[in-house]
From Swiss-Prot:
Protein family membership: Belongs to the MacroD-type family.
Recorded GO MF terms: O-acetyl-ADP-ribose deacetylase activity
NCBIfam families to which the protein is assigned, alphabetical: PRK00431.1-2 (NF001661), PRK00431.1-6 (NF001664)
Organism: Xanthomonas campestris pv. campestris (strain ATCC 33913 / DSM 3586 / NCPPB 528 / LMG 568 / P 25)
Alphabetized CDD domains for the sequence: Macro_OAADPr_deacetylase
Record-linked Pfam families: Macro
Domain Macro: 1-175
Positions of transmembrane segments: none
Name of this chain's protein: Macro domain-containing protein XCC3184
Length: 179
């Protein structure tokens, strides 16, 4: 079992599932969400539109997961999750972000998926501080692997050098604390 930090385009990874940092409508947007929609092709939008709304305009509330096929991606599945919008860290943002990772891992285990790739959820337009988000991503994935066998391979995908460094710093900090 391993956690890997990888810098590049999440849509190019050959994994069982990629996690999409989506918005509540699941109809595509900017950042990684837009990149995934473009790479997966028009059938992804059709699949997302077919998902039921839980309230007007909302197909996936913050912290929850919705599943679609990967369509034109190498990944067989896409887990769409909505991370929190950063306000000040005092409105359950850390718990909501942690839940995005934990629920994705739980669903991957239930589906017996062996590899999963995460973007830096909430770190784009949602404004989550990068180092705090990286620490949560590393904590949740490490904690998961301590008590579960699947998925065996977790990839934390950095879209730029700053994110790559933040993930590595979070991993190093946890390794030092564990020693």
């Amino acid at each position: 079992m391993r956690i890997e930090v990888w810098q590049g385009d999440i849509t190019q990874l050959d994994v069982d599932v990629i996690v999409n940092a989506a918005n509540e409508s699941l109809l595509g947007g900017g950042g990684v969400d837009g990149a995934i929609h473009r790479a997966a092709g028009p059938r992804l939008l059709e699949a997302c539109e077919a998902l039921p709304e839980v309230r007007p305009g909302v197909r996936c509330p913050t912290g929850e997961i919705r599943i679609t096929d990967g369509f034109d991606l190498k990944a067989r599945h896409i887990f769409h999750t909505v991370g929190p919008v950063w306000r000040d860290g005092k409105h359950n943002e850390p718990e909501q972000l942690a839940n995005c990772y934990w629920q994705s891992l739980k669903l991957a285990e239930q589906m017996m998926l062996h590899s999963i790739a995460f973007p830096a959820i909430s770190c784009g337009i949602y404004g989550y501080p990068l180092y705090q988000a990286a620490r949560i991503a590393v904590t949740e994935t490490r904690d998961w692997q301590r008590s579960h066998k699947v998925p065996k391979h977790i990839v934390l995908v950095a879209y730029n050098e700053a994110t790559y460094k933040a993930y590595h710093q979070a991993l190093a900090t946890q390794e030092t604390a564990a020693a």
